Amino acid sequence: MVRKMNKLAKRLASTSKSRQPEPESDSDGSEFDFDNAIEEKPMEAMDIEEVESDGDDDERELQAAFAAGLLKDGLNIQVAKKRPIINKSAEMKEKLAEITKDLPWVETLEVVTPHSEMDKKVENDDFQRELNFYKQAEKAVQIAYPRLLNLGIKVLRPTDYYAEMAKSDTHMQKVRKRLLGIQEMKERQEAFRRIREEKKFAVKVQKEVLAAKNTEKKNLAEAVKKHKKGMKQQLEDMLNNVKRHGLDQDDDAPTGAFGDRLGGRGGAGRGGAGRGGSMRNAGELKRKLKSDKFGYGGKKKGMKRNNKESFNDLFGAPRGGFGGRGRGGGRGGRGGRGRR
């Protein structure tokens, strides 16, 4: 039936295409291209009659099928029939009785537990359903365990039981070697990580120590600077006090060449430039003493060598003559180059 319907549809489509009118010429009056035109052969009268007769037969068949209720309104497609469910319980029980063997209970270990019904809520809950399975297995063990003990069958494993390994010793040695290698690699990585952390900690401690040292050095420099500033201020205060109050140089000044020039042991007077008198006067006195002893210019012929008289003159000279501190004298300058 379906093949006839498809065949009828193809024939109707071919006849509709053959009966289409030829296209008219363009409105602008252009000529038709006869060279490129496709020549169409007219259908013969016999072919048309065959198509019409076949179409009438197919239509009659479709009408008869529709009247018999084989066709429905709308799109008609062939629907495969479903295979009926086969449930031959009687035959299955007979076959079960044939294959059933009469074996002792030890060979089968069949245990029937009390039936426990499960509602829809428990069936849809995976956890509750698995829990019911566990309880059912537990009840089966409680039933089978005493029966096995009564039959004299050992159930529990002895303490000295040695089970043979499924894998050989060679394979287990390889596994052990592999595990030891993995453990050694982990220990090595842990050691490297610990060394890196120790290096980071050492660098951190070194930076902290260096920062503390720099801070201490800075604080010490500031303290020294403040101390120097205080000492300088204290020295300036002492000099100002000496200049302000002064000393009586005329009463304590000794007589003689050294006393007249340098102020004697009393130190510098009011017009002095430092300890022991003026730097200018000390230089002139030193130059005069050398000139008196060694002469003026020219070759001295070893006259600068020390002798008994010069030794005695050096240590016998008055101590306060070259700018030394006099009794009651104030603080003066550094003195000449010989003093230093």
Curated annotation (Swiss-Prot):
Predominant location? nucleus
Listed Gly residues bias regions: 264-277, 318-333
Localization: Nucleus, Nucleolus
Q: Which residues form a coiled coil?
A: 206-245
- One CC-aspect GO term: nucleolus
* One protein family per Pfam: Ebp2
Q: Where is this region: Disordered?
A: 1-59, 245-340
Q: Where is the composition biased (Basic residues)?
A: 1-10
A GO biological process of this protein is: ribosomal large subunit biogenesis
Residues annotated as signal peptide: none
> Source organism's superkingdom?
Eukaryota
Q: Where is the composition biased (Acidic residues)?
A: 23-37, 46-59
Record key words, sorted: Coiled coil, Nucleus, Ribosome biogenesis
The entry's function note states: Required for the processing of the 27S pre-rRNA.
What is the similarity comment for this entry? Belongs to the EBP2 family.
Mind telling me what this protein is named? Probable rRNA-processing protein EBP2 homolog
From which source organism is this entry?
Caenorhabditis elegans
Lineage, opening ranks: Eukaryota, Metazoa, Ecdysozoa, Nematoda, Chromadorea
